[in-house]
Amino acid sequence: MESHSASKALPLDYIIQHAQTLSKEDIRDDIVGDIYRTSASICKESVQYTNTDKLYRSEKLDKIFTSPIWGFPIMLGILSIIFYLTIAGANVPSDMIAEFFGWAEGYLTSWFQAARAPEWLHGILILGLFRGIGAVISVMLPPMAIFFPMFALLENYGYLPRVAFNMDRLFKRSGAHGKQSLTMAMGFGCNAAAIMSTRIIESPRERMLAILTNNFVPCNGRWPMLILMASLFMAAGYTGSMQTLVTAGVVVGMVVIGVIMTLTVSWVLSKTALKGVPTHYTLELPPYRKPKVWNTIVRATLDKSIYVLKRAIVVAAPAAALTWLLANIFIGDTSLLMYFVNFLDPFAKMLGLDGFILAAFILGLPANEIVIPILLMSYLSTGALTEIDDFNQIKNLFLENGWTWLTALNTMLFSLLHFPCGTTLVNIYKETKSAKWTFLSFAIPTVIAIIVTFLSTQLVHWLGLV
């Protein structure tokens, strides 16, 4: 009886550890492997193939794409090519769209003047709202129209499941679920949608890990900031295709930092607040298929690009108008925006930023897409959003306000690591039904962004590089 009572009192962790010693850790993989080999043997004996090269093509490709040696370099190479094409292909369309909005703004301004509309009304609607919408469309639409279709082509071809297979090993070591790699991949498009995609993870603990760390993957709203900073400062000493290549390399480096941070935070949480044993799952690798290129491009453009752009415009319009009001309502000789900026400036300087940058991130909480327009508007003495059609003009504006390469680096790091946008936070609350976890999803990346930028600033100054 005493022995029976003692066994009843055994802690759950001990029982799990004891059960794991009774079988190999990869027994599930062994079972699935045996099933696959038996099925292949039966097919080989009973089915005749006229084209054996096509039969084994998937296996030959998988040996390369899922190789422990070549899998990750190929993955980074493909990602670099996507970013290179996105950056190189988006420049001209962005300039054309910006010029169109500048032309339209002139006509609208003439119409307001002819109608003798009040200056404040023209300021809110044209210099604030209309320019804000124009900035968002010109900066976001061309990259999205290139990035999303290419990403969709990889998905339809069957490559993304191979990426998940490669990442599964890393996520398992960090205490997370392998399916988190799929939700992380979706975060490249939109973190808010990626939060909903975490439903594919059955374990509540591992699903919470995916929710809390998904923000470290840069979404489409943060690509413009990363690309702009990388091209203006990190690739400043290069021209032509080399500048584009360096810019793409820096952006890929930021993505790698985001993935490392995802794995690190997942590991820490799995050892502290979200303790548990990682669950196993079998990832089915579909055969490689030739994608329907035109259909994929059209669907990706309409379903993803236009949807994200529409959401950005809906959020950017009122935010741009609000920023114009803050910049043009004065108490004495100082605008409300400048009071806010001056309040933030001492703390922001510790992070290698300034009050304008930190204010732009805070006011850009509704959507990351509007951080750049708000930042540019805040720097201008006129208090109006500027057109984003001349990168040299933008760089000169930054340099006049004391920017260095360290400022650009910390702006990129803060953009990569800081709190989720408003839409993502709403989705997190809907999925978790918990104010506590929603707050933690805001606080964890924010604290990490502050620590990382602070340390990078202190290190660079200590080394005397700035």
Where are these regions (language model features)?
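Juxtamembrane inter-helical linkers in multi-pass membrane proteins
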Residues: 103-107, 111, 161-193, 275-300, ...
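Transmembrane helix-loop junctions at the membrane interface of multipass transporters and ion channels
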Residues: 224-250, 426-434, 455-465
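Juxtamembrane helix-loop transition segments at the membrane interface in multi-pass membrane proteins
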Residues: 98-100, 154-173, 197-214, 235, ...
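Hydrophobic alpha-helical transmembrane segments of multi-pass integral membrane proteins
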Residues: 133-163, 167-194, 316, 346-380
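Extended, low-charge hydrophobic alpha-helical regions
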Residues: 30, 91-115, 119-132, 174, ...
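Membrane-embedded alpha-helical segments of transport systems
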Residues: 189-194, 213-230, 249-262, 366-372, ...
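Alpha-helical transmembrane helix bundles of large polytopic membrane transport and channel proteins
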Residues: 1-51
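Selected transmembrane alpha-helices and immediately adjacent juxtamembrane segments
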Residues: 58-63, 67-155, 247-358, 439-466
